[in-house]
């Protein structure tokens, strides 16, 4: 039986909409709230605070089907020394290559995985290890096209399908929890982890260190993406890293750990 994760990769999110960094509530574009006027500057702040990686979503691209915020993404990648993963509107091999050529480490596809499995397989074969699948679900059912369309496909079924097609990993977002700070959907995550042989990163609803510690207890979970929790001040990135990241509090000898008190 798998053991609880030794640590989680804590990944700040930057969601791009019309050139700004925003947060949505349950995926609702009408409820977009600006969290930073300058996304590049915000990315640099997260990197300075110790982020091991950055998660960037092109919300305009997710709706339109074509990456819209490429100049901003290119600027973020150029100025950061940490790896950047990008999703939103990547529905062709050409677009995936374009992002990787900019220096993006991982490309995250969602709609393609549901609507064009053959294209997903072509992408994973052409770009091995670089294509991750974003599985976004409402009550366990997969949503696509920037969360604007819900399908009858079960998230667990899609996990099994994409790992057979060569995906490198999965980012699972519970749309009903997204932006709520109400806590992650642990039961759904357990179901995802039970069928996945791939690394899984959780997103949606994380609002406290207690939530992060609950995620840490899930066997096989690789990481957690934080958005609103960081921007609202509910969690600070340094304390999240100390709580569940590599070298977390529990891994320190008592005399060293006391320095963080």
From Swiss-Prot:
Keywords: Amino-acid biosynthesis, Cytoplasm, Histidine biosynthesis, Isomerase
Superkingdom of the source species: Bacteria
UniProt pathway: Amino-acid biosynthesis; L-histidine biosynthesis; L-histidine from 5-phospho-alpha-D-ribose 1-diphosphate: step 4/9
Family annotation (SUPFAM superfamilies): Ribulose-phoshate binding barrel (SSF51366)
GO cellular component term, pick one: cytoplasm
Cleaved signal peptide residues: none
Active-site residue list: 15, 136
Entry GO MF terms: 1-(5-phosphoribosyl)-5-[(5-phosphoribosylamino)methylideneamino]imidazole-4-carboxamide isomerase activity
Uppermost EC category: isomerase
Alphabetized InterPro entries for the sequence: Aldolase_TIM, His_biosynth, HisA_bact_arch, Isoase_HisA-like, Isoase_HisA-like_bact, RibuloseP-bd_barrel
Cellular compartment(s): Cytoplasm
Reaction catalysis annotation: 1-(5-phospho-beta-D-ribosyl)-5-[(5-phospho-beta-D-ribosylamino)methylideneamino]imidazole-4-carboxamide = 5-[(5-phospho-1-deoxy-D-ribulos-1-ylimino)methylamino]-1-(5-phospho-beta-D-ribosyl)imidazole-4-carboxamide
GO biological process: L-histidine biosynthetic process; L-tryptophan biosynthetic process
EC identifiers of the protein: 5.3.1.16
Family of the protein in this entry: Belongs to the HisA/HisF family.
Protein name, per record: 1-(5-phosphoribosyl)-5-[(5-phosphoribosylamino)methylideneamino] imidazole-4-carboxamide isomerase
Phylogenetic classification of the source organism: Bacteria, Bacillati, Cyanobacteriota, Cyanophyceae, Synechococcales
């Amino acid at each position: 039986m798998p053991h609880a994760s030794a640590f989680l990769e804590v990944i700040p999110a930057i969601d791009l909409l019309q050139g700004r960094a925003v947060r949505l509530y349950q995926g609702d574009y009408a409820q977009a709230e600006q969290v930073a006027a300058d996304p590049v500057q915000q990315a640099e702040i997260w990197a300075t605070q110790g982020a091991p990686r950055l998660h960037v979503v092109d919300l305009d691209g997710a709706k339109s089907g074509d990456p819209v915020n490429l100049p901003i993404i290119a600027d973020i990648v150029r100025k950061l020394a940490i790896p950047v993963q990008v999703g939103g509107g990547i529905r062709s091999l050409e677009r995936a290559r374009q992002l990787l050529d900019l220096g993006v480490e991982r490309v995250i596809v969602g709609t393609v995985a549901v609507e064009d499995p053959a294209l997903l397989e072509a992408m994973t074969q052409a770009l091995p290890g670089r294509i991750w699948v974003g599985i976004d679900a409402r009550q366990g059912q997969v949503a696509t096209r920037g969360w604007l369309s819900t399908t009858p496909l079960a998230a667990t079924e899609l996990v099994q399908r994409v790992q057979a097609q060569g995906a490198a990993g999965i980012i699972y977002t519970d749309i009903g929890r997204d932006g709520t700070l109400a806590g992650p959907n642990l039961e759904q995550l357990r179901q995802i982890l039970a069928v996945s042989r791939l690394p899984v990163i959780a997103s949606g609803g994380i609002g406290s260190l207690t939530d992060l510690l609950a995620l840490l207890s899930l066997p096989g979970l690789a990481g957690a993406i934080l958005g609103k929790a960081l921007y609202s001040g509910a969690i600070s990135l340094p304390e999240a890293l100390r709580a569940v990241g590599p070298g977390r509090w529990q891994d320190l000898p008592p005399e060293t750990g006391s320095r963080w008190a």
